[in-house]
């Protein structure tokens, strides 16, 4: 499945292209319906999928009751996250994953290696017009 990059304004006044995917989450434990769609950044440098706490709260998670962990971004600063089992909805697929939640995330969500890349082969193609990426589902035994 092919998707166009999303064009986002930068702090420097220009624009940048991001590989972002329409995403939803649901609370697996409560069999709840998925939340409203939001854009999640595809980030091969992220170890796991991380979402803003407000999204977890909207599906009934008690964020601070999750398994406490830490993640470190490119700044080198450690950020406390809370892990929860959720259902991740991406176009055409529903995945059961363990994801981190924090109120320190400056965007709605990040799709990382554990939880996303382990299920998809992602091919980035910034040379196409418009620039885009392709997702191919990996089915494991």
Describe the residue ranges of each PLM region.
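Pepsin/retropepsin-fold aspartyl endopeptidases
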Residues: 1-141
């Amino acid at each position: 499945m092919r998707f166009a990059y999303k064009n986002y304004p930068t702090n420097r006044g220009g624009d940048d292209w991001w590989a972002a995917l329409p995403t939803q989450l649901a609370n697996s434990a409560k069999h709840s319906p998925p939340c409203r769609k939001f854009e999640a950044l595809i980030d091969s440098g992220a170890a796991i999928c991380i979402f803003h706490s407000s999204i977890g709260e909207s599906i009934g998670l008690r964020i601070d009751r999750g398994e406490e962990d830490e993640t470190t971004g490119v700044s080198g600063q450690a950020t406390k996250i809370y892990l929860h089992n959720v259902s991740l909805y991406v176009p055409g697929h529903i995945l059961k994953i363990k994801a981190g939640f924090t109120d320190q995330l400056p965007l709605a969500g990040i799709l990382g290696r554990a939880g996303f890349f382990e299920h998809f082969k992602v091919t980035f193609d910034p040379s196409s017009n418009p620039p885009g990426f392709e997702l191919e589902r990996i089915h494991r035994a």
